[in-house]
């Protein structure tokens, strides 16, 4: 087991958010906060400083995950951002700066494996374990880890 990560969950469907929270905790990590919209994320304390954020694309109050991603990159630039969505085709080629995506529907094991892989890379980049099939990485992920190692 790697060190424990501090994780933000941005998901407007309460049952999915609760499921994600259980998976995070089952992985030995901690949920710092949950949010259902960009407005909820903007209301979080500036010193929250998550290490990983799971972000849905379609959110409450006519907000979207792409805007949340930009906000997180500005306010918590060290956070890894992973979209969790059934709408993978809605993610732009540059991932809006995010580090990867997990497609819905997802399996418990798939999310747990992705969390552990990302945690391994956060604390000792690049990860020493193989990337799980559940995580579709963006070019930003490898670039971040190569920059950290250099």
Summary of predicted features, one role per range:
Residues 104:
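A Lys-centered signature of the CheY-like receiver
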Residues 107, 116:
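Receiver (REC) domain switch/active-site region of two-component response regulators
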Residues 113, 120-150:
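CheY-like receiver
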């Amino acid at each position: 087991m790697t060190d424990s990560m501090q994780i933000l969950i941005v998901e407007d469907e309460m049952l999915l958010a609760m499921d994600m929270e259980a998976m995070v905790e089952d992985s030995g990590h901690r949920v710092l906060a949950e949010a259902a919209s960009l407005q909820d994320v903007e209301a979080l304390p500036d010193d929250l400083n998550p290490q990983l954020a799971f972000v849905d694309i379609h959110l409450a109050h006519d907000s979207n995950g792409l805007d949340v991603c930009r906000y997180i990159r500005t306010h918590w630039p060290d956070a890894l951002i992973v979209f969790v969505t059934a709408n993978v085709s809605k993610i732009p080629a540059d991932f809006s700066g995010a580090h990867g995506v997990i497609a819905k529907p997802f399996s418990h094991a798939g999310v747990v494996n992705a969390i552990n892989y990302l945690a391994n890379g956060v604390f000792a980049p690049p990860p020493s374990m193989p990337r799980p099939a559940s995580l579709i990485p963006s070019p930003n992920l490898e670039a971040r880890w190569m920059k950290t190692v250099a």
